[in-house]
Design a protein with these regions (language model features):
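Electropositive, gly/pro-rich neighborhoods at or near active sites that engage anionic ligands
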Residues: 1-69
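Conserved catalytic alpha/beta core of Sir2/sirtuin-type deacylases, generalized to analogous enzyme cores
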Residues: 29-54, 68-71, 108-116, 121-127, ...
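Short, hydrophobic/aromatic alpha-helical segments in well-folded domains
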Residues: 61-65, 75, 88-91, 148, ...
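Residues at the starts of beta-strands that form the adenosine-phosphate
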Residues: 70-71, 98-102, 176
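Structural motif
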Residues: 71-73, 157-158
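Gly/Ser/Thr-rich loops at beta-strand to alpha-helix junctions
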Residues: 77-86, 108-110, 164-168
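Histidine-anchored nucleotide/phosphate-binding helix
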Residues: 78-97, 102
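C-terminal functional extensions of proteins
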Residues: 105-107, 117-206
Length: 206
């Protein structure tokens, strides 16, 4: 399936934008939040995730930030979706070859979140430096991060955090962070006033 998805991305009019949307759709692969993860549902979501009009300026802001950036940090969520995250990083590196890529994963197994072993298994370590948050926590708590992970967050010109857990633990703390996730629980569908499995791109400017 990875090669099929890569080809669909390559064939798209804008491969980077498509890869970013696919990576967001990959947030569906969450055995911690979903009662059932269905392959057909996932494949249908790739090209049909409900798109909020307010996401468009966020995406434009994201791409403009990447154009000027030297360091990019991706904070991952579920292990199942990091193959799509890797495909996104491939396109990001093609568009901005000088961009230094880092990926922050969970430090220990928690729910079905990605750890260093998962990132290496997918080959993501061939594209980016893989960092551990040192914690078995379904989110990212800056104050509890090891020094190298804190330094990566402090030095990154662009941060993209995936998933609801990262949004809950990182938002409203005065940092400039882009967020990408599907709304999979009532808390998020009510907060963003959307239907279940609606995709969200959000930006906090600090």
């Amino acid at each position: 399936m990875e090669e099929m998805l890569r080809q669909k991305i390559e064939d798209a009019a804008d491969p980077l934008r498509t890869a970013l949307l696919y990576a967001r759709a990959g947030n569906y692969i969450d055995f911690g939040a979903m009662n059932e993860v269905n392959e057909n549902t996932f494949l249908s979501l790739l090209d049909s995730v409900p798109f909020r009009p307010e996401d468009e300026p966020v995406m434009e802001s994201f791409f403009k930030a990447c154009e000027k950036a030297e360091r990019f940090l991706l904070i991952t969520d579920n292990c199942g979706e990091i193959v799509l995250d890797k495909l996104f990083l491939e396109q990001l590196k093609k568009r901005y070859p000088a961009l230094q890529l880092q990926v922050l994963v969970r430090g220990q197994e928690v729910l079905n979140d990605a750890i260093e072993e998962d990132a290496s298994y997918t080959g993501m370590d061939q594209l980016a430096e893989i960092l551990s948050n040192g914690l078995p926590l379904a989110g990212t708590v800056y104050e509890r991060l090891p020094e190298k992970a804190r330094e990566a967050m402090d030095r990154a010109d662009v941060i993209l955090a995936k998933g609801q857990g990262n949004y809950e633990t990182l938002s409203h703390q005065g940092r400039h962070i882009f967020y990408s996730f599907l709304c999979k629980c009532e808390l998020f569908t009510e907060r963003f006033r959307v239907l279940p499995l609606t995709g969200v791109f959000a930006e906090e400017n600090g």
